[in-house]
C-alpha cells in the first residue's frame, strides 16, 4: 500500500516529498542481483549496498576490511537489475577520510550505478558531505551507532542516551544543513530518534531507532532470519517466517513499515 506508483522509479527529490506526505520509506540491504530483483519487485523503495557485506558476506567481525573495490563490485551487480528502487552505496572505512578520497570513491560508486552514497558520522564528515553535495553527489548521512567507529566505541552499542542525545540532534541538524538527502539513525532510543525526525526536513531511516522515523532499513540476512554468524540485535524481526518466501517476506516487511506495525516496542530501545 504505497502512494508512490509501483512502476515509477524513485528519485532523490521524491524522498523529500515522501516525508512531506507522511509516506514511510522501505529500505533493505542487498549485495547481489537475485535478492535485489526480488526486493525491487515487492515494494522496497531504496536498496543499500551496505559495507555490512564485510560481516554477512565476507565473514569478517566488522565492516572495517571492506574496500572501495568490494563496494563497486556489489554495486554493479545490483544496479543492473533495478527498475524502481533507488540505489544507495556505502563509502567504506577510510574512503571518506579526506574530501578528495571521498570524491574519488563516490565517483566510482556512481559510475557503477549507485544514485547516492552513504557516509557515517558527523564532525569533520559534515564538511565532506557538503563537499560532495556541491559536486552534485547525493549523500545519505548515518548517525547513532556507526559501525565503522566500532574500535572507538568499544563495540556495537546503543547511542544517543543521556547527554549524548542533545549532540545527536545537533549532528542531525548539521548533516541536513550540509545537504544530506536522507539520514540513517542506528541503535538510537525511540524518543531521541523521534526528536531528530521532527528537527530535520530530510527523511530519517531507522534501524533500531523506533517507529517514528520516516522509514526503516534492515540487513538482508537479519530480516530473513539467516545466520550471519553474529548475535542478532534486538531490533531484528524474522519476516521469512511470516512471509513464507523471500518475496512474501519482502511484502510483509514493506507493509509492516508502511502501516507502522514495525518496529514495535519489542524491536526498539527505550531512553
From Swiss-Prot:
Co-factor binding comment: Binds 1 Mg(2+) ion per subunit.
Binding site for 3-methyl-2-oxobutanoate: 51-52, 90, 118
Principal location class: cytoplasm
Main enzyme class: transferase
Entry's localization field: Cytoplasm
Residues holding Mg(2+): 51, 90, 120
Keyword Metal-binding annotated: yes
Domain of life: Bacteria
UniProt-listed Enzyme Commission number(s): 2.1.2.11
Gene Ontology biological process terms, A to Z: pantothenate biosynthetic process
Gene3D superfamilies named among the record's database cross-references: Phosphoenolpyruvate-binding domains
Cofactors demanded by this protein: Mg(2+)
UniProtKB keywords: Cytoplasm, Magnesium, Metal-binding, Pantothenate biosynthesis, Transferase
Record: active site: 186 (proton acceptor)
GO cellular component, one term: cytoplasm
Pathway(s) of this molecule: Cofactor biosynthesis; (R)-pantothenate biosynthesis; (R)-pantoate from 3-methyl-2-oxobutanoate: step 1/2
Reactions this protein catalyses: 3-methyl-2-oxobutanoate + (6R)-5,10-methylene-5,6,7,8-tetrahydrofolate + H2O = 2-dehydropantoate + (6S)-5,6,7,8-tetrahydrofolate
GO MF annotation, one: magnesium ion binding
The keyword Lyase is assigned to this record: no
Function as written in the Swiss-Prot or TrEMBL entry: Catalyzes the reversible reaction in which hydroxymethyl group from 5,10-methylenetetrahydrofolate is transferred onto alpha-ketoisovalerate to form ketopantoate.
Subunit structure comment from the entry: Homodecamer; pentamer of dimers.
Family membership: Belongs to the PanB family.
Stated name of the protein: 3-methyl-2-oxobutanoate hydroxymethyltransferase
Organism: Stenotrophomonas maltophilia (strain R551-3)
